[in-house]
Each structure stands twice: as C-alpha cells, then as structure tokens.
Amino acid sequence: MTFEEFAATRMPAVLKFAAVLAGDRVIAEDLAQEVLVRAYSRWDKIGCLDRPEFYVRKMILNEFLSWRRRSVRQVLPGGAAGEPASTAPDHAHVYGERQALLAELGKLPRRQRAVLVLRYYEDRGDAEIAELLGCTPGTVRGYASRGLAALRVEMDPRPRARA
C-alpha cells in the first residue's frame, strides 16, 4: 500500500482516533499532521508492515503522551471528539452528557485517558493496550480502574456532601 492510498482510505479513522484522544478537533489535526509527516518519511518501512494503520495509531498515541514531557501539564479542552455531524437530531440531554463525559475525560492524566480511549473507543484488550503503551497488562488495568473511579466520582448525579 502506498502512502497516498493509506492517507486516502485510513486518514478519517486515524483522525477520529486522534480527536478522541485529544478531546479537540484542532489539536487532533495537529497531532495527525505531525505524525503523518514522520510516517511519510518512513513509509518504505511502515508500508511493508502487516498493519500500517496500527503503527500509525501507535505513533499518534506516543505523540499524544509525549506532550506531557514537552510542556507543563494542562487540561485538554473537551470537544465533539471529531465525530462527523449526525444526520439524526441529537437530543440535548444526550449531547450534554457526552460533552460532560468528554470534559471529565480531558481532566484525567494522559495515560489513564489513553487507556480508557483505547479500551472503550478502540475496543482493544489489555494486552494490546499494554503493548501500545509499553507497560504490563496489570498496569493497564490499574490505569483503567483509577480513570473509571475518577469519572464515576465526577459524573455521579447525586449531590456531594460538603465538608
């Protein structure tokens, strides 16, 4: 597969993955552009792989995680996760809940967020996530557990008692 074929057929899926990770379409486009420039320069090796998209997604994941090392920790803005506009009407309540979830997901540490996106959006197993992140499946489960616990606390509709 040539780079041009890859970009034409797989770019929307790769961009959507980046958008879910970043929580913002503009940031996702920057992520994807950075990665695709590097992928293009190495396409003679990447294009020969059985699953070049898997490799490019791993590059996007690594680029997303490396932002933390480059700058001070920041909360990524919540967004529509790069999803195309639906032709069906979106109910305000469902939209509000989705926006709230994306906002809370954006507050998680990057590795917890990455694990949750890979597990629930990409539907990947712990072993595959561990391979992508360069850690053990137990560490992946720990990140997922802590991330889900944080989301449960923040998304709980019951009012919290004030201390």
Predicted regions and their residues:
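Arg/Lys-rich amphipathic alpha helix in sigma70-family domain 2
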Residues: G47, K58-G79, V94, P157
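DNA-recognition helix of helix-turn-helix
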Residues: L133-P157, A163
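Short amphipathic alpha-helical boundary/capping segments
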Residues: E5, A100-L108
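A short, charge-rich alpha-helical start-of-domain segment used by transcription regulators
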Residues: M1-K16, V26-E29, Y40
